[in-house]
Structure formats: structure tokens, C-alpha cells
Curated annotation (Swiss-Prot):
Function: Part of the gene cluster that mediates the biosynthesis of the indole diterpenes penitrems. The geranylgeranyl diphosphate (GGPP) synthase ptmG catalyzes the first step in penitrem biosynthesis via conversion of farnesyl pyrophosphate and isopentyl pyrophosphate into geranylgeranyl pyrophosphate (GGPP). Condensation of indole-3-glycerol phosphate with GGPP by the prenyl transferase ptmC then forms 3-geranylgeranylindole (3-GGI). Epoxidation by the FAD-dependent monooxygenase ptmM leads to a epoxidized-GGI that is substrate of the terpene cyclase ptmB for cyclization to yield paspaline.
Name of the gene: ptmI
Descriptive protein name: Penitrem biosynthesis cluster 1 protein I
Annotated pathway: Secondary metabolite biosynthesis
InterPro entries assigned: START-like_dom_sf
Lineage, broadest ranks: Eukaryota, Fungi, Dikarya, Ascomycota, Pezizomycotina
Length: 153
């Protein structure tokens, strides 16, 4: 077993509750996250997600289109959000992915938004296979798009 972590952060000129509400509404990811091409699943995709929500995200990474079946695992309102692949989902070489969002208030009207993705892979995964899951430019583009969307309102 092997794992690797991608982490990025950005300062957004909005309070933590605004950033939290936006990014935990998974239907907002379409058109904001560069790899997200669609979201399907349980009722509640168009409002703040709650623990136990399951949904399927269609992802396109450089022409490789696949679906991930996510489940919201943990949350602390306006502070922390975590979702991961259920244990019955396997997408070689990755057998588990955990994504966390941390919302760190800076004063009254700014938030440090930190996104971390941990991928657990088979020991024999090649560097090329891992690269598709560790594209930090894509993660940074997502945070920049969240910032742009929230700060224009």
C-alpha cells in the first residue's frame, strides 16, 4: 500500500460560513471544479451536504472519464467537511480517496480554505497512474474558481 497527499489553500474574502455553504453544496462543483462534469445521487445535492449523503461525480481528467461514488463522512458546520470513496468502490490504481476541506476564519470577513486529497494506491501503481490523481494545478484551479465565484457576489 502507498499513499500520497495533495494540498492547496487560498484566502477568500468571504466569511467561513459563506465558503462552507457554497463548497458543501455538491451541485456547485459542476462548472467550478475543472474535472467535475456531473453530479447525481441522493436528494439534497442542491443544498449543504450532510453526513451520509452519497453521490456520484463524473470526472474528466485529461480525457480519462470515470465516475467516483462519494460519501460524506464527517462535518463540523463552517469548520470542516470530509468525503471519501466507500470501501466497496475501487478505481485502480486507487482504492481509497479522502478529501477534506478546512475553513479557517481570518477576522470577520476572510477565510483560509484548505483542500486536502489523500489517495491510497496499490503498491505497484506506476508514477504515471499516480500523476492523474495528484494534479495540483487542477486543485489550485478549483480553489481559484471558488474564490472568483464567491468574491464576485
Amino acid at each position: 500500500m502507498s499513499s500520497f497527499k495533495s494540498q492547496c489553500e487560498i484566502i477568500i474574502d468571504k466569511p467561513a460560513h459563506v465558503v462552507y455553504d457554497f463548497v458543501t453544496t455538491v451541485s456547485n462543483w459542476i462548472g467550478i471544479h475543472p474535472a467535475c462534469k456531473g453530479i447525481e445521487g441522493d436528494d439534497g445535492l442542491d443544498k449543504e451536504a450532510t453526513v451520509g449523503l452519497r453521490f456520484t461525480e463524473t470526472i474528466d481528467v485529461r480525457g480519462w472519464v470515470f465516475q467516483c461514488h462519494w460519501e460524506v463522512r464527517k462535518m463540523v458546520k463552517d469548520q470542516y467537511f470530509e468525503f471519501s470513496l466507500p470501501t466497496d468502490f475501487i478505481l485502480p490504481p486507487v482504492y481509497n480517496t479522502i478529501i477534506t476541506y478546512i475553513f479557517d476564519p481570518i477576522g470577520d470577513n476572510k477565510t483560509r480554505f484548505i483542500r486536502t486529497m489523500i489517495n491510497c494506491t496499490n503498491a505497484d501503481a506506476t508514477p504515471e497512474q499516480k500523476a492523474d490523481f495528484a494534479d495540483t494545478d487542477m486543485h489550485t484551479d478549483y480553489l481559484n474558481a471558488v474564490k472568483a465565484r464567491l468574491e464576485m457576489s
